[in-house]
Amino acid sequence: MSQDIRKEDGVRSATEYKLSMSSNPGSRRSSMADAESFNDDNMVLKNDVLREYLLPQIKDLTDSVVTLDSNMTRLNFIHDNLVDLNESFGSLLYGLMCNSWCVEFPNAPTRFDKEIRLMNEIEELSAEKSKLKSRLNSLREKPNAQTSDEKMKKPSGISQPIFQKPNVRRPRNALNDENLHKFNRENPPVYDDKREADEDTNSEASFVSNPANSKDMQLFANGSSNNDPKSRLRRKSILHTIRNSIASTSDAYDRKKQQGIQMGRVSLGGGAARVVSGRNMFEQQRTTRHSTTGIPNRVVKKRPPFK
């Protein structure tokens, strides 16, 4: 269509607008017929004025009308092209709209995003609610199952503990000779002078060397008016028994260690004395160190009996 318009534009020339002036003088108006009566000079002047002023303006007007005609033709051509462009652009927009409805764009903002988000939250809450309900039901059913199992397992008249202790073999708290001797070497006993002075009066040696004396027992009982003498002597006898047992075990260990060593022969020229070694020798040195000479008003030969 546009090519046809261009061809027509190239073939067709601009329209020429001519004045409607006939060459027949008889067809003129009466006013112009009356002009024949004027002088020839006046006619010449009028013709000159028309030629100089009116005819150029009329020519300009005709040229302008021709230019206007050509411009209007081009404007019509432009309008036709714009119509075609609008049709093609409208079809393009329609195709894009159809494509957008058919194809899903995940990152494109839509008005349904908020509703979709709310629906997802509602689904998550409903799933969590169902899980909590199932857990509650399981917790409610567990105690009933436990009670039924306990009733089935319990025999008549016997109550068994729920949590039974495993069969674990406990270590024996037995003291060996080596461990006991090591403990005595690392932790030597601490003795008090006053208690040693009181305990020396109740040792086995004192019981042998000093027989029972009723007067000393009365003095001893009168001196300890605050405490019961029987209970104190009983406690001291228990302590002596423990000490003697420890000393005997340490002696046995020393004998094992000192096998093969020849002991010097004890001369019998002097008085009778106890032959001790190891722990008993330490006890003898301690008893000699804590002698009774430092205690005032004490009779060594008269001691209370050992109980």
UniProtKB/Swiss-Prot annotation:
What Gene Ontology molecular-function terms does this entry list? identical protein binding; microtubule plus-end binding
GO biological-process terms attached to the record: attachment of spindle microtubules to kinetochore; cell division; centromere clustering; mitotic sister chromatid biorientation; positive regulation of attachment of spindle microtubules to kinetochore; positive regulation of microtubule polymerization; protein localization to chromosome, centromeric region; protein transport along microtubule to mitotic spindle pole body
Record field: compositional bias (Low complexity): 20-32
Q: InterPro entries recorded for this chain?
A: DASH_Dam1
Similarity comment text for this entry: Belongs to the DASH complex DAM1 family.
What this chain does, per the record?
Component of the DASH complex that connects microtubules with kinetochores and couples microtubule depolymerisation to chromosome movement; it is involved in retrieving kinetochores to the spindle poles before their re-orientation on the spindle in early mitosis and allows microtubule depolymerization to pull chromosomes apart and resist detachment during anaphase.
User: What is the designated name of this protein?
Assistant: DASH complex subunit DAM1
